[in-house]
């Protein structure tokens, strides 16, 4: 299952978040979806060399917030924010709504799966040997702090007539573990002999739920409650301890109990044994 399903979609709502956050009625849903596709396509065409990894879209009443995640924010922003203003006006004319454009910088491009896939694809387009490009990408990602990485290239690798598929990996990539922070990206390298598909999985570690730390006041309150516990609770715990003990210890404990407090069956057994001895 983990090998077939999309790694990001598999973890949505657990450790991953949606790239589009909005709600629309049945009538407006198709319109909003086509607007999202237009926005993403326009941004990717406008900034081809800006190393854009992801575009997040949020919608309010008459306002659309677009967050662009990029490893080269200077190319997107331009001198004095000139290119950002141009892009915002272009997007507003495209969809006919007010657009707020946010630029988010990616600190480590080697840990972003889509950017790693793009770097491999660009090298293949420049006629670099695909094995060399894949090995360099794996080395850089592991040096940047990745726990594991897997790269898959498929197509007419090396210009051969029959298309094939080659996979390289290093470290571990636990696809079935939902708490594992696995980034996934895919792209195409356009060559003279045909397209080469590149897929990249990057394992960046586990995302664990935050443990609730008890304050000192809570600890003192619990101690006070335990100190003031009634005697009935204590006796119940003793009975539970006896039930959890092995059989021999339980029989020994029953023998120590006085005859008046023993149940009727135990008393009858004791009387039968005394009669047989006599």
UniProtKB/Swiss-Prot annotation:
One of its GO terms (molecular function) is structural constituent of ribosome. Residues 39-107 form the KH type-2 domain. InterPro entries: KH_dom (IPR004087), KH_dom-like_a/b (IPR015946), KH_dom_type_2 (IPR004044), KH_sf_prok-type (IPR009019), Ribosomal_S3_C_sf (IPR036419), Ribosomal_uS3_bac-typ (IPR005704), Ribosomal_uS3_C (IPR001351), Ribosomal_uS3_CS (IPR018280). Keywords: Ribonucleoprotein, Ribosomal protein, RNA-binding, rRNA-binding. Residues 255-278 are annotated as: Disordered. One of its GO terms (biological process) is translation. The keyword Ribosomal protein applies. Part of the 30S ribosomal subunit. Forms a tight complex with proteins S10 and S14. Belongs to the universal ribosomal protein uS3 family. This is Small ribosomal subunit protein uS3. It comes from Dehalococcoides mccartyi (strain CBDB1). The gene is rpsC.
